[in-house]
Amino acid sequence: MNMPLISIIMPVYNAECYLNQGILSCLNQSYQNIELILIDDGSTDKSIEIINNIIDKDKRVKLFFTPTNQGPAAARNIGLEKAQGDYITFLDSDDFIANDKLEKQLNFMLQNHLVMTHGNYAFCDLEGNQIKLVTTSKKIDYLTLLQGNQFKIMTVLVERESIKLLRFPNIKHEDYAFFLDCLKEVKQSILYSHQASSFVRIGKVSVSSNKFKSAIWTFNIYFKREKLGVVKSIYYFILYAYNGFIKYKK
């Protein structure tokens, strides 16, 4: 049986505290036909040392560099250029995934002839202990995603051929903008499992000014990038804010 190759794209920037766990959560997958593409974005800590130690032991790991520190969008775009897989997924360097995630997600896609799927996820504390499960819609299309970003970057698995021309824009909330573009191409993403298989590490301090900046970034995506006009941009922004409030308060 042909085993599709899955490319996992991970930007790395000063991630020495949690990088090893994130990498091993990929390499220890029950589905082994993967390539892990690491893009260092100008790290000044021990991240490269950690990566080199792993590369010596596992040839599935590939390391690339940005010329200067350019942010996650540029790093992920290098990963998209270098990826050879039939399917693409992403992981941030301080997060991790369940060991059977890719096997279950890929099998679900192959059995149901799907191009793009997503899963539920959980927030964890800095030690990796689960704090809160976040559930997502069974089916997400472009209009659904406009009402609130239900994806975390590592929850999505998508057929590479279907998004081969897409890249992350160099803006804030670049992942949200990228997935909006994806859903213009593939039309919908389907939930493959109700269990959390992706784990997002969060800090213990939430800064109100960052929430205000995030709100501006989101509105700019609606108004400037999606060109929805003032009224529709305000409408979807209100839905986005409401759904975000509900998600974090449940």
Curated annotation (Swiss-Prot):
Source species, domain of life: Bacteria
CDD domains linked: Glyco_tranf_GTA_type
Alphabetical keyword list: Glycosyltransferase, Transferase
A matching Pfam family: Glycos_transf_2
Entry's Gene Ontology molecular function annotations: glycosyltransferase activity; hexosyltransferase activity
EC code: 2.4.-.-
SUPFAM superfamilies: Nucleotide-diphospho-sugar transferases
InterPro entries in the record: Glyco_trans_2-like (IPR001173), Nucleotide-diphossugar_trans (IPR029044)
GO biological process, one term: biosynthetic process
Family label: Belongs to the glycosyltransferase 2 family.
Name by which UniProt lists this protein: Uncharacterized glycosyltransferase HI_0868
Origin species: Haemophilus influenzae (strain ATCC 51907 / DSM 11121 / KW20 / Rd)
Taxonomic path: Bacteria, Pseudomonadati, Pseudomonadota, Gammaproteobacteria, Pasteurellales
